């Protein structure tokens, strides 16, 4: 079986000898699926089988979860014999092997995100680790760390029928500061019991280093996905959790957003990726890292230049948290009509 994914005209061909993994990836990247392609830029091959034996090599890096080897353009990421990724930068191919279905899907999912992140940046489009929603022509991005409450906030915002989704945790920003949707999936610690999201079909996502999550593909909410690119009116929020007390959404000068932007966009903490694919140890790769950092910085600057900025001190009242965001979105939208 095979699957074509089109990310801003970078085509990734995904093939697998296991149908279940490909079905899950199709649902994850549903909005980027196309039936055929005349040319392919990257190939990802997924094998549910015993990883092949490694050739004689010296490890260039050891981590808690894997050993990394390199021969010429090929990089081998050995997950303690349980899984193996072979990335050939010259041929633009990634081969992933494992007998463990959950491990196979997790590595494949992260590998595709890693590839598209770098390729999008070559086109001047960057990811930001944030919840993205829209109201009319007003886009709102809420930057929060992993497990900070982005999906929980979305479950309450989406109860308003005028709210549309840009992304659960990874909208895109171009070099003009415009926001592009990246609708993949919603991830929750537990399945919602009420509201629009409770009616979705949820799947268990078992992760190696992190607790299990429940995910639902946004293809089930096609009428709630934002299809326009937005940029004229933007609210940019840096969120902080409170142990107790009432939530506060307060405007701040743009310079106060520099550190949150560095964390959530320029460094990209929390963005899905196989970091081992990009651990490099030569001068050429260091220059590439500087290049990608520069692209992210330009996108971030243009986004910040357009945005009205807020700090959001979030208390335990989730409905009130959502209402504060909604009130600000309506105020901006109505003031610009």
Language model region names:
Residues 150:
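Conserved lysine of the Walker
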Residues 153-154:
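Post-Walker A alpha-helix
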Residues 1-146, 159-164, 172-337:
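A noncatalytic interaction/capping subdomain that flanks phosphate/NTP-handling catalytic cores
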């Amino acid at each position: 079986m095979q699957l074509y994914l089109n990310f801003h005209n970078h085509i990734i061909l995904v093939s697998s000898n296991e149908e279940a993994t490909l079905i899950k990836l199709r649902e994850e990247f549903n909005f980027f699926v196309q039936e055929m392609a005349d040319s392919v830029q990257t190939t990802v091959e997924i094998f549910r089988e015993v990883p092949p034996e490694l050739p004689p090599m010296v490890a260039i890096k050891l981590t808690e979860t894997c050993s990394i080897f390199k021969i010429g353009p090929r990089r081998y990421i050995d997950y303690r014999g349980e899984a193996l990724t072979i990335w050939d930068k010259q041929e633009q191919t990634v081969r992933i092997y494992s007998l463990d279905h959950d491990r196979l899907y997790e590595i494949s999912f992260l590998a595709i995100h890693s590839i598209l992140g770098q390729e999008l940046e070559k086109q001047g489009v960057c990811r930001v680790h944030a919840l993205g929603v829209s109201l009319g022509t007003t886009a709102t991005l809420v930057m929060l760390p992993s497990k900070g409450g982005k999906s929980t906030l979305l479950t309450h915002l989406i109860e308003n029928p005028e709210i549309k989704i840009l992304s659960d945790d990874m909208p895109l920003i171009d070099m003009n500061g415009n926001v592009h949707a990246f609708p993949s999936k919603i991830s929750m610690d537990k399945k919602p019991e009420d509201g629009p999201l409770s009616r979705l079909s949820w799947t268990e996502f078992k992760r190696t280093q992190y607790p299990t999550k429940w995910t639902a593909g946004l293809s089930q909410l096609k009428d709630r996905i934002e299809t326009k690119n937005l940029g004229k009116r933007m609210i940019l929020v840096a969120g902080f959790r409170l142990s107790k007390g009432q939530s506060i959404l307060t405007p701040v000068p743009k310079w106060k957003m520099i550190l949150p932007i560095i964390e959530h966009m320029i460094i990209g903490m929390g963005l899905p990726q196989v970091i081992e694919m990009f651990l490099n140890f030569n001068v050429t790769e260091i220059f590439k890292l500087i290049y990608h950092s520069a692209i992210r910085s330009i996108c971030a600057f243009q986004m910040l230049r357009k945005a009205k900025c807020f700090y959001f001190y979030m208390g335990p009242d989730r409905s009130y948290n959502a209402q504060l965001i909604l009130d600000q979105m309506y105020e901006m939208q109505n003031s610009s009509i």
